Amino acid sequence: MKRSFSKRNRQFMVVAIVILAMGVMLAGCGRSNERPEFLTAHEWLHYDSASNETISFGEDGHFAFYGDEGNPVGNSDLYDRYSYDSESKAIKLKPEGDMKIKVLRHEKSRLLLDIDGDVKEFFDGKDERIAGGAPQNLEYDLDNVASGFGSYLAIISKDGSKIVTAPANYDGDDPEFKEYELSEKLADHATFYSWVYDVDESGMDVKSNCRKVTEKEAAKMISDGAAVGFVWYNEKAEITKIVFWGSTVTQ
């Protein structure tokens, strides 16, 4: 009787282990093959100084990453399939290669990605309310002040290391823009700059001035309102640098 019970107990344990192992394998497969709606239901667009970039995640698993002229960004044309791992937040590309993409955050109409160590924010091109948020006249950036920026945003408020941002065409008088506000964190030793360029009416004579400002000066610029700027992020989705932007037209 004792032997029979021991044998049945061992058999039960073996079956339980097999079932558990299969469950873990299936769960892992499910995580790595996800195609979540926050990726597939949007037309993700990144405003870049040279060419706007579109990254596409199809419901069927198709992947593409290209510029305004349809040209691939970097070596992205080596990949045409993707899957999303919800545990690691990694977007795995196929065929396997060196390109690495990780989701750092996703909020309403905003997606922050780490692409091979280059952190970029993408906006939903289907969202008409924020369609006017692209930076303008970057051809005047003769000194490459904004080169490599991660996002272009309205800076709404600052409280210590907390900073509230929104799409650059933010309208504080429109209550529907409230849902686009996002509380973000400044990295330790974040830097701030004020960049202003003067252009004459012909658009030919351009004088550009970019100077570093203190955190106190930056806070005042934000509290005075109408603060818009280029933003850089690190791999923790923390803001490392802001270049506040403005322009004047001289007679």
Annotate each language-model stretch with its function.
Residues 77-87, 114-135, 238-251:
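Edge beta-strand at a domain terminus
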Residues 4-15:
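Bacterial N-terminal signal peptides that target proteins for export
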Residues 17-21:
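Hydrophobic membrane-insertion alpha-helices, especially the h-region
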Residues 30-45, 129-133:
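N-terminal helix-cap/turn-to-beta initiation motif at the start of protein domains
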Residues 48-53, 64-119, 176-191:
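Contiguous, well-ordered beta-strand patches that form the walls/edges
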Residues 25-28:
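C-terminal motif of bacterial Sec signal peptides marking the signal peptidase cleavage site
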Residues 68, 72-74, 133-251:
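Solvent-exposed hydroxyl-ligand-binding patches built from regularly spaced Ser/Thr
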Residues 37-43, 55-63, 86-88, 104-111, ...:
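Short, solvent-exposed coil/turn segments at beta-strand boundaries
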